[in-house]
Regions:
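A ligand-binding cleft/hinge motif common to bilobed small-molecule-binding domains
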Residues: 102-106, 228, 233-251, 301
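Periplasmic-binding protein-like
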Residues: 126, 205-210, 217, 249-272
Length: 355
């Protein structure tokens, strides 16, 4: 039986970076034409590294209005940062679109991002942007559980409703989580719960949780995919409209943890030294200055969280109260990243999947 567990009234917020291996978006065939009035004279191709190809229509709109072609590469935030560092900070992509903001904070500290100043930046919530305009947020990713009802029934397993429940021995070997060193979403889980629980209690929690984790996947989508494939009973996963849609296709339960919903802002930035830096910088301004573009982003993202980023925008209404989110300091996502990941690597041991 498909059901939605939540004691909170909430709606879901609705290959290589350095080689030319991208694909041109084609979900809606773009019409390349002369730039529209108000757009600067831009040319060439803008290469975008993104966490998903769901944004094709947004980039096609940019192409139609500016004449700049777009190539997209799909990569998680941790992979982007690792490859950028490995190549000495010389990118072959221009725009970084999506992924946990912790990696963007680290990239800024490493001098790998371009400063992007524009008037509309003043309308963005300062909590979710860099004070010096080196990175911005396009929304928030919230995290909960996806449970395979068939497996849960076969294993006589209770549906977990809280983070504390996952420590029960009945879930041993049946929980999958993504490697937080690769998945910004799951790094957000670790950082948020450590902030909420405190260092000592938080690390004790993850040590205990590790006993029940089957393995740590290399992409943020692994928990969702493995649960619907009947491989594992419980996945720690992002929650959005794409997860909601699974209720119509699979015998699963979506769980919003009653003891707190972790989240992480999703970043947007321009790579320093990018080949088409002008197009990438203009895209950032084009996106945030026009509410129509942000509304399209919300539609494609199947989230309303862009309203949190730009509270003044019209055309999108926030589908939930931010009170449901855990109370954390966003700045710590970046400053604590290296220490947390180093400690978590030891904790994971041979359960971490890196390839």
């Amino acid at each position: 039986m498909k059901k939605l567990i939540s004691l909170l009234l909430v709606l879901v917020m609705a290959l290589s970076l350095f080689a030319g291996c991208g694909t041109t978006p084609d979900a809606t065939e773009p019409v390349t034409e002369a730039p529209t009035d108000g757009a600067p004279a831009l040319s060439g191709t803008m290469k975008v590294v993104a966490t998903s190809e769901a944004y094709v229509d947004l980039f096609n709109k940019f192409t139609a209005e500016t004449g700049v072609a777009v190539e997209m590469l799909s990569m998680s935030s941790g992979e982007v940062l690792s490859k950028l560092r490995a190549e000495g900070g010389t990118p072959s992509a221009d725009l970084w679109f999506g992924g946990g903001v912790d990696a963007f904070m680290s990239a800024k500290d490493d001098g790998l991002l371009e400063q992007v100043n524009f008037d509309a930046a003043a309308e963005l919530d300062p909590t979710y942007k860099d004070a010096d305009n080196y990175w911005f947020s396009k929304g928030l990713t919230i995290v909960g559980f996806l449970v395979n009802n068939t497996l849960a029934a076969e294993l006589e397993m209770d549906i977990p409703t809280a983070w504390a429940d996952l420590l029960d021995e009945q879930y041993a070997g049946e929980i999958i989580m993504s490697n937080p060193a690769i998945s910004g979403t799951n790094y957000g889980v670790v950082n948020c719960l450590l902030q909420v629980m405190g260092e000592e209690e938080g690390w004790a929690y993850f040590e205990a949780l590790n006993e029940n984790i089957a393995y740590y996947g290399r992409r943020g989508s692994d928990p969702k995919n493995k649960v619907i494939a009947d491989e594992y009973a419980v996945g720690i996963t992002f929650l959005d409209g794409t997860i909601d849609a699974l209720l119509e296709q699979y015998d699963v339960t979506i769980v919003y943890p009653t003891d707190g919903i972790p989240y992480i802002p999703e970043g947007v930035a321009v790579f320093k030294g990018a080949e088409n830096v002008d197009a990438a910088k203009y895209f950032v301004e084009w996106l945030y200055a026009n509410d129509e573009n942000l509304a399209l982003l919300a539609q494609l993202d199947q989230k309303s969280a862009v309203k949190v980023i730009k509270p003044s925008m019209e055309g999108v209404e926030l589908a939930y109260s931010t009170d449901i989110l855990v109370d954390v300091d966003v700045a710590l996502f970046g400053s604590q990243r290296e220490d947390i990941l180093a400690k978590f690597e030891v904790l994971m041991g041979d359960k971490a999947v890196t390839e």
